[in-house]
């Protein structure tokens, strides 16, 4: 984060921000704990399309950064899928729209399925649990993903309906990602500064988004009405 951006957002110089704010932010980063993985098992965490077994919707969100001058580092944050250098964070959202998992910063050249498999130890699930993801997760076990029209295959009406159902439900991940990205730290210009500081800001913003989603569920009311109560594994 450069001096101009710091003064624009916080009304203080870069040196003052690093001296007075960053130590507090680092301590807060170590203590913050508002993302609750077990909320996925809430008896109201159901959808009419997926009344049993499905607990999480998965996706990734990106955080834009300045292009590094050294390609030895820049090669990890430049991906042709995006028009800008960035880091990725994998997120999991309950069917009720609550943020239940967020990974650390991942290189943007990493494939979503590989990130999921590499972080399995951070989000253990029961053998009966199922997940919903987009076309980047078909190689992951226990995932429902869209059917692709590859090799000349023409989707049948049933397959088209299935894809529409998945997209309708999985769009809840995109809403949660929008709440995360609405933090003013990530608006406008790309992040400039040390990756270790970006990690702190991203983690605090992720936990803050989890709190905001829970507060919004109480007032003005749930954005996504839960169904139940009943167990996920009947």
Residue ranges with predicted function:
Residues 2-234:
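Short, well-ordered secondary-structure "scaffold" segments embedded in the functional core
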